[in-house]
Curated annotation (Swiss-Prot):
The lineage of its organism: Eukaryota, Viridiplantae, Streptophyta, Embryophyta, Tracheophyta. Its main location: nucleus. GO terms for cellular component: nucleoplasm; nucleus. InterPro entries: Homeodomain-like_sf (IPR009057), SANT/Myb (IPR001005), SANT_dom (IPR017884), SMARCC_C (IPR032451), SWIRM (IPR007526), WH-like_DNA-bd_sf (IPR036388), Znf_ZZ (IPR000433). Residues 43-66 have a biased composition (Acidic residues). A zinc finger (ZZ-type) spans 355-409. Component of a multiprotein complex equivalent of the SWI/SNF complex, an ATP-dependent chromatin-remodeling complex, which is required for the positive and negative regulation of gene expression of a large number of genes. It changes chromatin structure by altering DNA-histone contacts within a nucleosome, leading eventually to a change in nucleosome position, thus facilitating or repressing binding of gene-specific transcription factors. May be involved in positive response to drought stress and modulation of root growth through its interaction with NMCP1. Residues 1-68, 667-702, 760-784 are annotated as: Disordered. Plants overexpressing SWIC3 are hypersensitive to drought stress. This is SWI/SNF complex subunit SWI3C homolog. PANTHER family: SWI/SNF COMPLEX-RELATED (PTHR12802), SWI_SNF COMPLEX SUBUNIT SWI3C (PTHR12802:SF61).
Length: 784
């Protein structure tokens, strides 16, 4: 292919020539060659397109014309998406700002994910969005991950380190308390990401050689061991500043001192150690004075050698804590707890209650009900203003936060807690509005429609609900006297002592209504049915209409207190008092009616249960009958199949016997015998012998044996004939090819006859005293 051998310079020359003359109409040959060149040199064209900014001979108007008149759709898409202008933003990591004509699909995915996060739709759309690294606030020079082949893992420590870190936002305050090996550990607010049991991403950036997997001696477990040793050393005396010289005894060999120094300086930088230490020196001024040196000429020279380590790259002040180590020790000493573990938990709770507060992780303002919770760190939350202004915490972006609306959560949680008064209002609303849940929710007043429906479904359909609901006391106090009236319990039995059976006032339904008995009957008629309500009304009426001596005596006793109760006296048409019903009697009647209704409902329930059992048994019997009918039908079909099989077997045996008889008749015919002179010819020329037919078994010629042999074979039950019948039966069952009777010939070889009938004779001797032992010619036409 001559086009494959073209050089890169030729392809670039063609590209530039075509780009300078985009409007010229090329000839068909040139157009086809240009298309072929573009197809063959796609890589060269891409490299030329990348380096098109270096071509100073092409004017800007030519580029515009190229965008308008280019015929290659791939080039049009590439040039239309990204403009050639580029502005460098950062040298490390390399970041370039480019102008685009239309957003990339990844940008659209990020915008959709941010909108869903702001709307509180969950993290389903966030999972599909690309991973972003925020370089706007505090992360312009922070690497989120270090690859195993990164330059920072080089063994040469004299080279400048590629680790660059931006100072965190200092958050002055009381700090955050954490548990570390049974002791309290106070860290700054901006170091709340630290956890003794895990390794944070910022820690992996400081000592990446422990997490690259290149060295078997440097493992994450070893890093955690060194880090925890340093922190434990500091917690022995938090008021004293821990220096690197004091930590050198924590490692066994000098090769680990460099890693230990980086760990100590990192922990000191973030305030994980020396946060409560007093007398700390302003590290920024100390480093500034140590890096500047005045030359004899009077010029100031900046020393770059110390900047090779992390110590020179992080230049910011130490975080200061408003608390002192004595405050923590005083709190620990004042706690009067016997159990050590329980004391630590209680002390931790006290310190957290005093030091920590629910505030924004960036501006430290108290969080409102609407805020944004981090998906990476559980203790990081932002207020609405900081989130919308993109003031994120180090290592976070907008996709790492989830919208939290406290009002919605509170309303959902409140839907699970119902007071007795709200439950009563719900039952009253159901009784009043039937199934109109909007009116029921308005009647309750404090719950929504869905919460009312959910709570009503969860209510137990038992009398235990009424026992747990507290109803305000009635205006008339309850009396234990029953005036001798019989009391019916839930089972309908009569009890002699009413005070042991009558429940208190707060356990009777509709006790505060003007007529408790009628209210109960009406409720049962609408909820349970007219028959249950009729039994309740009948029992209550029987109690109210009992006329005995005790009632007459009670009328005289209650005459002084007429009109005081909630139930007025009944008067006749003449204006006289006809009867007076005491509140206790009304309660007794309501309870008896309720017991009768419960008994009636129980009877109906038992009747329905028996009906269900009867119907279930009927269904099962019908299914069993269907199964029996199917089994009977299958048995009949099986019987018919067996009969057909027997008939087919008899027909097969008859056909086999007929076939054997016909074959025997053909073989015993005198025309099959040949002169003896042909025997030598057949024996001398074995190739002239016709092959044995496939359908005739090897023992077929034995059917025409002489009488002495035949008699001998008959005396032993004809084994050869049985074998012949078995072979014929197998041939009929095997669906193999069938040969006509005319094709069956007797062509026994001399060796076969000698072996069967004269095994003692040599193979060269062929007796001709019997017709079966004489060989026949292959061209005998008398057979068939």
């Amino acid at each position: 292919m001559p086009r494959k051998a073209s050089s890169t310079s030729d392809s670039r020359l063609k590209w530039r020539k075509w780009k300078r003359n985009p409007t010229a109409s090329p000839s068909p040959s040139n157009r086809s060659s240009a298309a072929a060149a573009a197809a063959d040199h796609s890589d060269d064209s891409d490299s030329a397109a990348v380096n098109e900014d270096d071509d100073s001979a092409v004017p800007e108007d030519a580029d515009d014309e190229t965008l308008a008149g280019a015929e290659d759709p791939v080039l049009d898409l590439r040039e239309a998406e990204v403009l050639p202008s580029a502005e460098p933003v950062s040298a490390f990591p390399v970041a370039t700002r480019r102008v685009v004509n239309r957003p990339h699909p990844s940008v659209l995915a990020v915008i959709a994910a941010e909108r869903s996060a702001c709307a509180g739709e969950g993290s389903a759309a966030v999972a599909a969005a690309p991973v972003l690294e925020n370089i706007s606030y505090g992360q312009q020079q922070v690497l989120s991950g270090v690859l195993p082949d990164h330059a920072s893992l080089a063994t040469d420590t004299d080279k400048p380190s590629t680790y660059v870190c931006t100072p965190p936002n200092l958050m002055e305050g009381h700090g955050v308390t954490k548990q570390f090996q049974g002791r309290l550990h106070v860290v700054p607010k901006h170091s709340d990401w630290f956890s003794p049991g895990i390794v944070h991403r910022l820690e992996r950036q400081v000592v990446p050689q422990f997490f690259s997997g290149k060295s078997p001696g440097n493992t994450p477990e070893k890093y955690m061991l060194l880090r925890n040793k340093v922190i434990a050393k500091y917690l022995e005396n938090p008021s004293k500043r821990l220096a690197f010289a004091e930590c050198q005894g924590l490692v066994a060999n000098t090769a680990e001192l460099y890693d230990l120094s980086r760990i100590v300086r990192f922990l000191d930088t973030w305030g994980i150690i020396n946060y409560l230490a007093s007398g700390s020196v302003h590290r920024g001024l100390r480093m500034a004075t140590s890096l500047l040196r005045e030359e004899p000429t009077g010029e100031l020279q900046l020393l770059t050698a110390p900047l090779k380590s992390i110590d020179g790259l992080i230049l910011f002040d130490r975080p200061k804590c408003n608390l002192q180590a004595e405050d923590i020790s005083s709190l620990a000493s004042n706690s009067e707890v016997v159990d050590f573990d329980a004391g630590l938990a209680e002390l931790d709770g006290k310190i957290r209650e005093r030091l920590s507060e629910s505030s924004c992780s960036y501006c430290l303002q108290p969080l409102t009900s609407l805020h944004y919770q981090s998906l990476k760190e559980a203790d990081i939350a932002l207020c609405s203003d900081c989130f919308h202004d993109a003031r994120y915490i180090t290592g976070h972006s907008s996709l790492d936060f989830q919208r939290i609306d406290g009002d919605n959560d509170r309303s959902e949680n409140d839907g699970d807690s119902w007071t007795d008064q709200e439950t009563l209002l719900l039952l009253e609303g159901i009784e009043k509005y039937n199934d109109n849940w909007n009116n029921i929710a308005e009647h309750v007043g404090t719950k929504s429609k869905a919460q009312c429906i959910y709570h009503f479904i969860r209510l137990p359909v038992e009398d235990g609900l009424l026992e747990n609901i507290e109803v305000p006391d009635a205006s008339v106090p309850f009396r234990a006297e029953t005036n001798g009236y019989p009391h019916l319990d839930c089972n309908g039995s009569t009890s002699g002592n009413l005070p042991q059976k009558i429940p208190p006032d707060n356990q009777l339904p509709f006790i505060n209504s003007s007529n408790p008995v009628m209210s109960l009957v009406g409720f049962l008629a609408s909820a349970m049915g007219p028959r249950v309500a009729a039994s309740c009304a009948s029992a209550a009426l029987s109690v109210l209409t009992v006329d005995d001596d005790s009632r007459v005596n009670s009328e005289g006793i209650c005459s002084d207190s007429r009109g005081q109760g909630p139930h007025p006296n009944f008067r006749d048409h003449n204006g006289g008092v006809s009867s007076s019903i005491s509140p206790e009697k009304v309660k007794h009647a309501a309870m008896c009616g309720l017991s009768a209704a419960a008994t009636k409902a129980k009877l109906f329930a038992d009747q329905e249960e028996r009906e269900i059992q009867r119907l279930t048994a009927t269904v099962i019997n019908h299914q069993l009958k269907r199964l029996e009918l199917k089994l009977k039908q299958f048995a009949e079909v099986e019987t018919l199949l067996l009969k057909e099989c027997e008939q087919v077997e008899r027909i097969r045996q008859r056909i086999a016997s007929d076939r054997v008889r016909i074959v025997s008749t053909r073989l015993a015919s005198p025309g099959n015998s040949l002169p003896g002179g042909s025997t030598s010819t057949m024996s001398s020329n074995p190739m002239s012998m016709s092959p044995r037919p496939m359908g005739v078994p090897g023992s077929m010629p034995q059917s025409s044996m002489p009488a002495p042999f035949a008699n001998n074979m008959q005396g032993h039950g004809h084994p050869q004939m049985a074998f012949l019948q078995q072979q014929q039966r197998q041939q009929m069952l095997s669906f193999g090819p069938r040969l006509p009777l005319s094709a069956i010939q007797t062509q026994p070889s001399p060796q076969t006859s000698n072996i069967m009938f004269n095994p003692g004779m040599p193979n060269s001797v062929t007796p001709n005293h019997h017709q079966l032992l004489r060989s026949s010619s292959g061209n005998n036409s008398s057979v068939g």
